[in-house]
Amino acid sequence: DVEGRLLEDYWDADWDKVELHFAQMKRLGANVVRIHLQVGKFLVAPDQPNEKSLERLSKLITLAERTGLYLDVTGLGCYHKQDVPAWYDNLSESERWAAQAFFWRAIARQCANSPAIFCYDLMNEPVVPVGKGKTGAWLGPAFAGKHFVQYISLDQQDRPREEIAKKWIHQLTAAIREVDQRHLITVGLVDWSLDRPGLRSGFVPSVVCDELDFVCVHLYPEKGKLDDAITTLKGFAIGKPLVIEETFPLKCSPQEFDQFLDRSREHATGWI
C-alpha cells in the first residue's frame, strides 16, 4: 500500500482496504494482480503451514473471483528481513529446497480449484551464486528497505550454475504438480539472466526454463538506452510466451517508457 506494507501486513486488520484496492484495479482495466507471499507468514516450520494465513489467502482468492481479476501468485518472499524465521536461514540447501517445496504444495492446494489463478511465480528474482557465499546470507542487498533478490544456494561447489537452477525449478514445479496440474508456473527473472558478459543470475532462460509454462522478465528501461532494453527483452524470447512481469519508468521518462512498451509488443505477450 502507500505505506510500503505488504499485503500480508494489513489483510487481517484492514480487509476493507484490500477490497477497495481490488475494486479500483478492476475499474482501471487491470486483469491480473500480482501478490507476494512471504515464507515467514505462511510457514511456522519447514513442514508446517500457517493455517490462518492459508485461510486468508482463500478469502483473497474468493475476492479475486468475485471481482473478476486473476492472481499472479508469487511465493517464497523474504522481502522484510526481520520477518524471515531464523530456522529458515539455518537450513541447508537441500532442507531449504524441501521447505520451499512444502510451501508451494500448501499454496497450490489452496489455489488449485480456483478459476482466478493466473499463475504461480516460484520466486521473485532468484540467483545462483558464483563460488561459496557466507553462511545464512540468502538475501541480496536491500533496495528501498526490501530484499527482492534471493540466492537458491550458498555454495556452487563444482556444479554449473544453470544445472542448480534447473534442479531447483524441477523440485518446486513437481511439488505444485502433485496438487495442481492445470495452472501455469513461471519464475520472475532479473534482466541480467542472459548468457552474456557481466553480471548473470545463473538462470539463463534458454537453458533453465524447460519446465516453465512461460517466461517472465523484470525489465526497467534506462534513459537513452531503449535499444538495449529491447535487445535484452529479445534474449528472453525463447519460443515460450514472454511476459514482462515488472516494469516501470524508474530510470527513464514516461515518454520513453511509452515507446518501450510499444516496441516491446514485438516480443512480449503480456505486461504486469
What are these regions, as identified by a protein language model?
Residues 174, 227-250:
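P-loop/Walker A phosphate-binding loop and immediately adjacent motor/lid segment at beta-alpha junctions
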Residues 203-208, 231-236, 260-266:
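Mature extracellular/periplasmic domains of secretome proteins
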Residues 1-214, 224, 247, 251-252, ...:
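Active-site mouth of glycoside hydrolases
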Residues 198, 226-230, 253-265:
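Histidine/acidic-residue-rich catalytic or RNA/ligand-binding cores of hydrolases
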